[in-house]
Amino acid sequence: MKQIYLKSRAKINLSLDVRRKREDGYHEVEMIMQQIDLYDNILIRERMDSEIVLSTNCIFIPTTSSNIAYKAAHKLKQRLDITRGIDIFIDKQIPVSAGLAGGSSNAAAVLMGLNHLWSLGLSTKELMEIGVTIGADVPFCLLGGTALAEGIGEVLTPINSDIKNTWIVLVKPAISVSTGDVYGSLDLSKIVDRPPTAQLLEAIKEGNIYDVSSKMCNVLETVTVNKYPIITEIKKKMMEYNALGAMMSGSGPTVFGIFKSYERAKSAYEHLSLFYKQSYMVQTYNGGTEIG
């Protein structure tokens, strides 16, 4: 039976602004998203029957039809009237419920993997159109690299970034945060500081990590930090260990710091990992989902 291996990469937000709440309940956002070299390994293998069977090494994610990667496979099969079945195995390395789009990345990898495995010939744009019906971050995870995301996150403008291979340290505290609860608690009238998106985009294009680090802003911190003071604690530690800037990614609770060199990132990682079990040292990545 045919099979395919994929690397399903995480993302961080270099900025996140919420512009308004729509009548359908969704929030319109303006955010800069950056792929990083932290990934889950995914194996997709054909089955003799028509079933979708998902398994994983992680006890914290479902293996039923509620799993976003399962939904991606089901949606693609349904859309193209495909009766073939598949096994999906997810070797989870990206922290769960962390603001890093781990689930969305898995869904994107499944869409891309099945497109390749079954020689469907769908374009990235067509895959993104399917992906947005599953989750707002799925289109970016298909695109990869660096992008400005607008709408509910599905309107993407690729950015010609010059901050390639920048060293990042991530810390995911031992708490879980509900994205829905964070957005539900956000009071748009009380947001004072918003990301200077145009200036950030210019700094990214110029490869100026000092300006990127100093101008990063996430308005969702106004909610999550108040509920979970540990996020502020981690940000302070990042700066003490020579980060150029530190910020919460997405709705949290993961905090990341940007470092100007491998040596400084490694030193910070070694110190932070003494306090926080889920600490990671990674780089920015610009290659999208990797097959094989």
Swiss-Prot record:
Record-linked Gene3D superfamilies: 3.30.230.10, GHMP kinase, C-terminal domain
Residues bound to ATP: P95, V96, S97, A98, G99, L100, A101, G102, G103, S104, S105
Molecular functions per Gene Ontology: 4-(cytidine 5'-diphospho)-2-C-methyl-D-erythritol kinase activity; ATP binding
Pfam families: GHMP_kinases_C (PF08544), GHMP_kinases_N (PF00288)
Reaction it catalyzes: 4-CDP-2-C-methyl-D-erythritol + ATP = 4-CDP-2-C-methyl-D-erythritol 2-phosphate + ADP + H(+)
EC code(s) of this entry: 2.7.1.148
InterPro entries: GHMP_kinase_C_dom, GHMP_kinase_C_sf, GHMP_kinase_N_dom, IspE, Ribosomal_Su5_D2-typ_SF, Ribsml_uS5_D2-typ_fold_subgr
Keywords of the record: ATP-binding, Isoprene biosynthesis, Kinase, Nucleotide-binding, Transferase
Protein name: 4-diphosphocytidyl-2-C-methyl-D-erythritol kinase
The organism of origin for this protein: Alkaliphilus oremlandii (strain OhILAs)
Gene from which the chain derives: ispE
